[in-house]
């Protein structure tokens, strides 16, 4: 069993890369969240969308590998959104990909072991990330500023260097780049985990 862990700041290309990796038979480990779904997000594929009470119950029942709480303003009202992964048994005969922030990555590695994880940092300039956020629709400046601020706190160089095995510089939305990125990551995965192509 091996897992590619994609991490990176908001709108750095993690979801698009995950989708390309699924074409190489990677199985997405779906995180849970208590935030509302965005346009074009599908329950069970992008996230498991649950009510905040349900998420808090999973925490209290010790069902989570890792979770984070983010205080935000949603529709001009203070709210807390949770993100996290439940404890699940992974099939040792399958390839996996998961998207996590750095703290989640650290906890995931503690749970599954470093030898089973290949951590990829998706790097992208702030201006490009903001352009992508605006193009997603329903852009909210206050929420974007909160996310950028959280990213600056979360993605410190020392922690990145400690956890990251590989960095992808994702400068554009050129759809021709994504298959190339996925092909390289799949090749590295095959070599690292001694898998057949």
Role assignments for model-derived ranges:
Residues 33-96, 103:
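ATP-dependent small-molecule kinase phosphotransfer cores
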Residues 95-102, 112-135:
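Conserved phosphate-donor/acceptor-positioning beta-strand/loop module used by diverse small-molecule
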Residues 18-19:
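The feature captures the helix immediately C-terminal to the Walker
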Residues 14-15:
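Walker A/P-loop
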Residues 9:
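P-loop (Walker A) phosphate-binding loop of NTP-binding proteins
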